[in-house]
Amino acid sequence: MSSVRESSKDESIVHPPKAPESEPFPDGGARAWMVALGAGGVLFCTFGYVNAFGVYQDYYITHQLSNYSASDIAWIGSVQTFFLFGSGLVGGPLFDRYGAKVIWAPAVLVIFSVMMTSLCTKFYQFFLAQGILGGMSMGLSLAPALSSTAQYFQKKRAAAMGITIAGSSLGGVIFPIALEQMLYSSLGFAWAVRIVGFIILGVMSFAVLGIRARLPPKRQRFLKLEAFKKTHYVATLTAVFFLNVGIFTPFFYLPLYGQSHGMSTGLAFYLIAIQNASSFFGRLVPGVIADKIGPYNMLSTVSIITAIITFCWIRMTTNASIIVFSVLYGFFSGGIIGITPAAIANCAGHPQEIGTYIGMGMAVMSVATLIGPPINGALLNEYGGFLQVQIFSAAVMMFGGVLAFGAKMISFSGEGKGMRKFDHAVAGLAYYVREGGSRMEHIYFGSVAIVAGHLHGPVCAQNKRQMLVTGIGAEMVYVLEYFVEAG
């Protein structure tokens, strides 16, 4: 038990970047919390607003874009989400080089893109105004907002960034409900979208005024590609990639899943709002705990729990059970979203490099969010049901949780020693996977083997190379067997 406490202490204290003694992290105070709240306002207007695209898609398919398929219209939202994260590759380094003022121009463009969307009538217009301009301007705002909060906090970083990211959950509750009510009222499309634009104008104005960089701008190379030579950083981003391939599946498909099991359209619509409301608390509570036990301990824990809950989704077919799933999934997946930026920020060697590290991490996330939904859509079209979608999403998140555990061991054990411990952990997984039992038992209890492999590495390390390969591939093999049998 003492070794667990020691590892948590090492992770949370040793590895976050050290500020110079003359510039200690405030870890609180009016200015620091104002920045966290201001950044939360930015996420409310960007990430939170993007969560409302499902409402737009339902409206477009019966109104302006009725001649286009749902798959065609979905590209508007996919491109918007891709640029929301991908533009961080530019926004993060700009924050490190020029400070908080870099957020002003994209903040104006966010409002401009919403107002232009209200005037659109053709597909290419929606694609340009909402998909490309909206996504890019939001992404250029998002990365500096996250980076500004990270500059003010070290010991309380996960909690502070959880507060910031909770702004997106609040937006994910308010914007879909507001749009749903206004679009189908006497207001019509144009004024419904403009009212949303005015809401964003008010919140974004407060947010921009609240955000300040703590440290002076630092002249440096735009990207720090040498960061990808750090095993710790690469392991973290690999884990984040797999987590983001699967994490958004229920946000895209849960209403459709509910309707396919007899849920009314009205109740199914509110499932996303329920998820986002639960996610609000999921981005706060795990962040507070992460500051006590370490962000990687918390990230791997909530990732594995989220994956297990997603496997349980297979058996949830009644209205009550689907709503329970929505609440549980929203909370624990919110923990993943809330802790991820703190874990990435901890990889930076200096506080003035945090923006660049977060920006490069967001670029990796953008690829995952771009390919995840189409894979799920292809599985749904191929098999005509949700089983393969559920298994795929749960499996990649379980794998991401395992990798997050490996990144944690690398972070506080040193690169060589950490990799040896990770080998033992995966060998432990292989040992349990190969010892019989049903396939679902392998998937459900594989996470237990990670801990067993860490605690009993020498026992499980016989024929380690063979077992390592088996351990990494075992879970995916069982998933593929499901697909083969279903086909």
UniProtKB/Swiss-Prot annotation:
Entry GO CC: plasma membrane
UniProt xrefs under CDD domains: MFS_MCT_SLC16 (cd17352)
Membrane-spanning residues: 35-55, 75-95, 99-119, 126-146, 159-179, 191-211, 234-254, 262-282, 293-313, 322-342, 354-374, 385-405
Induction info: Expression is positively regulated by the aspyridones cluster specific transcription regulator apdR.
Molecular function per GO: transmembrane transporter activity
UniProt feature, compositional bias: Basic and acidic residues: 1-21
Major localisation: membrane
Gene3D superfamilies assigned to the protein according to its UniProt record, in alphabetical order: MFS general substrate transporter like domains
Residue positions with a glycan: N67, N319
Top-level taxon of the source organism: Eukaryota
Disordered as annotated region, ranges: 1-25
Membrane topology qualifier: Multi-pass membrane protein
Keywords: Cell membrane, Glycoprotein, Membrane, Transmembrane, Transmembrane helix, Transport
Pfam families documented for this protein: MFS_1
Subcellular location: Cell membrane
Coiled-coil features, chain-numbered ranges: none
PROSITE patterns found in the cross-reference section: MFS (PS50850)
Role this protein plays: Efflux pump that may be involved in the secretion of aspyridones.
UniProt similarity note: Belongs to the major facilitator superfamily. Monocarboxylate porter (TC 2.A.1.13) family.
Protein name (Swiss-Prot/TrEMBL): Aspyridones efflux protein apdF
Encoding gene, per UniProt annotation: apdF
